[in-house]
Amino acid sequence: MDLKYLNQKEAIDVDQELFTEYKFSVDQLMELAGLSCAHAVAKCFPAEKHPRILVCCGPGNNGGDGLVAARHLSLMGYTPTIYYPKPTAKPLFENLSHQCQMMDICGVKECPSVATAASDYDLILDALFGFSFKPPVRADFVAVVELLQQTKLPIASVDIPSGWDVEKGKLTECDVEPALLISLTAPKLCARHFRGEHHYLGGRFVPPALQRKYGLNLPTYPGNELCVKL
């Protein structure tokens, strides 16, 4: 059987079933997802060559994955800087932000220009929007999406390249073109349109019964790895 690519409804259903049927908590899955993202980044963009990472976080769970990834990347020898234009006023996200602050991870208030990003960073982690995204991009995020579209820096996108349709992929030719896509739990249909160099699967937490129910046919994670190349 081939690896299954999920449509938007299937992605939402799988997520909800992890919470309701399998009793995972949001922070539990977010920690595992963000950690797997950090490991995928480290495999593709070693800290020796790409130490400075701009981590762009959105308002939902995708942004939470980015905050977790930033914390772990800081422990792996990277220097992450967080751009979080619309922080989520929920204890989970406030705690994740606080953890980053306590680990001396800096943040920026304004979205860097293309030129500033080119001089100050080596890589951008795109953790803006996940599989629940529906266009258009809200005003708070227009500047950072334009940065992602225009930058020459390599981009690592968490689950969905920001601005893409979860099923159809790019909506315009100028949409984000990440070098690394980290699909979480299972790849979404838009990943079929990914043309970048690196595609990894992260989120090593899917119960076998859930895999069978949805026919996910996920690849085997090698050894003790937290992500697997697709």
Curated annotation (Swiss-Prot):
Catalytic reaction list: (6R)-NADHX = (6S)-NADHX; (6R)-NADPHX = (6S)-NADPHX
Job of this protein: Catalyzes the epimerization of the S- and R-forms of NAD(P)HX, a damaged form of NAD(P)H that is a result of enzymatic or heat-dependent hydration. This is a prerequisite for the S-specific NAD(P)H-hydrate dehydratase to allow the repair of both epimers of NAD(P)HX.
Binding-site list for K(+): N62, D126, S162
Family note: Belongs to the NnrE/AIBP family.
Gene Ontology MF terms in the entry: metal ion binding; NAD(P)HX epimerase activity; nucleotide binding
EC number(s) reported in the record: 5.1.99.6
This protein's record includes keyword Isomerase: yes
Record-given protein name: NAD(P)H-hydrate epimerase
Keyword terms: Isomerase, Metal-binding, NAD, NADP, Nucleotide-binding, Potassium
Top-level taxon: Eukaryota
Organism this protein belongs to: Drosophila yakuba
Span of domain YjeF N-terminal: 11-218
CC terms in the record's Gene Ontology section: mitochondrion
InterPro entries for this protein: YjeF_N_dom (IPR004443), YjeF_N_dom_sf (IPR036652), YJEFN_prot_NAXE-like (IPR032976)
Enzyme class per UniProt: isomerase
Residues where (6S)-NADPHX binds: N61, N62, G63, G64, D65, G130, F131, S132, F133, K134, P135, P136, D159
Co-factor note (free text): Binds 1 potassium ion per subunit.
Cofactor: K(+)
